[in-house]
Amino acid sequence: MAHKKTYSQLRSELLARYPVGLTKGGVSIDDIVQLRLQSPYESHLDVARAMASVMRADMAAYDRDTGKFTQSLGCWSGFHAQQMIKAVKRLRGTTKGAYVYLSGWMVAGLRNRWGHLPDQSMHEKTSVVDLIEEIYVSLRQADEVALNDLFNELKDARAKGATNKACEEIISRIDGFESHVVPIIADIDAGFGNEHATYLLAKEMIKAGACCLQIENQVSDAKQCGHQDGKVTVPREDFIEKLRACRLAFEELGVDDGVIVARTDSLGASLTQKIPVSQQAGDFASSYIKWLKTEPITDANPLSEGELAIWQSGNFARPIRMPNGLFSFREGTGRARVIEDCIASLKDGDADLIWIETDTPNVDEIASMVAEIRKQVPDAKLVYNNSPSFNWTLNLRKQVRAQWISEGKIAEADYPDGTALMSAQYDTSELGREADDRLRQFQVDISARAGVFHNLITLPTFHLTAKSTDELSHGYFGEDRMLAYVATVQREEIRRSISAVRHQHEVGSDLGDTFKEMVSGDRALKAGGAHNTMNQFAAE
């Protein structure tokens, strides 16, 4: 996107072309100004370039002040993304620091042609590209609707003979309008194939608008959700080649500031598909192989037909191989492998951010790993998955209980261990309140102590849709009937100033009326007349 021109600049340029203020066909230059300001991006590739610059600026701001971390919610439709960003703008008065996360899990579970699938790269890869494009269409339409309202306000003011000062104030709001378009962090899973397949998919995702790609170090054809068992990682040189594929896609398309997130699943991954070939001591292959689970080859434990042996520390050893041919890592090596993964991705893979998939939300655990990584890469920054796969209530209450017992503040018998801590009776207890305070502070703490630049929740709109639909259905099909809808949905929309309560306006009905006026004038057949029931929701 070129430098954004102001209302006055565009109008002056058009007036030079059409001195009477109209085209030969009778179109007003004021209408052309409106359409151009409503659609400043020539393509979604233009969006990717602009949002990459936004993200780079945010990363630099975080380096100066860890309190300036960014956030996102995972969205499985353009409408979810649009409503999230509208809510942020209504709350903060700005979209600054708010992104959209595109979750591969939700694409698999909700946005593919084969039904609800697990997060195992089983869905068609084009679904990811389609969702990126859909999200940006929705965000850009939110801009069009909001700016159309401002232009209608300007037209009404002029029609009523408002002063120049009053009109200039509206024009100032048009020029200062902050777009709903924000960066997307898009999940490319493990690349959906080999390096070339990764590159081809990355290009399509970028052309759809993605300024940031997140890729993981699992085997593409054996990929699992990061919070499931049976994860299989690839050797580091293989993963670095996929990172390079993503970088080449950005470079080819001229997205110089494109951001790559390298995710490691090694903390919970106990298997590898292959043993890489080491060329010399200390290379990527040797540092990967050293963590394999092996057993010594002796006269009492010789090699059998078809078995493999590797040379380690001056002796031959047998790597433990599963019945499916996969090789096992030694137990307790996940943390060390994560640290090595992250350093390699940042130093040799040209990744910009790292993502460590964990099994519990523990600030101390993440911070300790980041401290080791920063010995090699001092400015290492993370994306952290505040995952719905964690039982947050139970985890935080258990952390508080354990700490208070170790400090002598409580006895073990004061609060139960395990799932009993989930009981609602502890919601208002001292321990429950402390756990909730830590939840409220969690993202601040992990960003300050563990280098987390971006906090996201992967699947919130999946769970929100399930919960809100259940809530409405329970009342509507129960005794409350229409009261259930009015009390739990419509009244809340009105009282919270949620623009979607005017659903016709939200999806662009007024945009259509405006365009009809542009081309038809008084002949326009408009939907927004006196008999439109949306008038019942007009702002007081």
Swiss-Prot record:
What is the uppermost EC class here?
lyase
Q: Name one Pfam family in it.
A: ICL
Known activity regulation?
A: In the presence of magnesium, inhibited by oxalate, potassium cyanide, manganese, silver, cadmium and to a lesser extent by succinate, glycolate, iodoacetamide, DL-penicillamine, aluminum, sodium, potassium, lithium and strontium.
Q: Name one GO biological process term.
A: glyoxylate cycle
Cofactor remark: Can also use Mn(2+).
Q: Which residues bind substrate?
A: S103, G104, W105, G226, H227, N385, N386, S387, P388, S389, T458
Task: Report the domain of life of the source organism.
Answer: Bacteria
Catalytic activity reported: D-threo-isocitrate = glyoxylate + succinate
Q: Which GO terms describe its molecular function?
A: isocitrate lyase activity; magnesium ion binding; transition metal ion binding
Q: Which residues constitute the signal peptide according to the record?
A: none
**Keyword set for this entry?**
Glyoxylate bypass, Lyase, Magnesium, Manganese, Metal-binding, Tricarboxylic acid cycle
Instruction: Identify the catalytic residues.
Output: C225
How this protein's activity responds to pH is stated as: Optimum pH is 7.5. The enzyme is stable when incubated for 15 minutes at 30 degrees Celsius at pH 7.5-9.
Which EC numbers characterise this protein's activity in its record?
A: 4.1.3.1
**Its annotated pathway?**
Carbohydrate metabolism; glyoxylate cycle; (S)-malate from isocitrate: step 1/2; One-carbon metabolism; formaldehyde assimilation via serine pathway
Q: How does activity depend on temperature?
A: Optimum temperature is 45 degrees Celsius. Loss of activity is 0%, 16%, 30%, 82% and 100% when incubated at 25, 30, 40, 50 and 60 degrees Celsius for 30 minutes, respectively.
Binding-site list for Mg(2+) = D187
Cofactor or coenzyme needed: Mg(2+)
Q: Which Gene3D superfamilies does the annotation name?
A: Phosphoenolpyruvate-binding domains
Keyword Lyase among UniProt keywords: yes
Q: What is said about its interaction partners and assembly?
A: Homotetramer.
Record's function text: Involved in the metabolic adaptation in response to environmental changes. Catalyzes the reversible formation of succinate and glyoxylate from isocitrate, a key step of the glyoxylate cycle, which operates as an anaplerotic route for replenishing the tricarboxylic acid cycle during growth on fatty acid substrates. May be involved in the assimilation of one-carbon compounds via the isocitrate lyase-positive serine pathway.
| Family membership | Belongs to the isocitrate lyase/PEP mutase superfamily. Isocitrate lyase family.
Q: Which PANTHER family match?
A: BIFUNCTIONAL GLYOXYLATE CYCLE PROTEIN, ISOCITRATE LYASE/MALATE SYNTHASE
Name of the protein in its database record: Isocitrate lyase
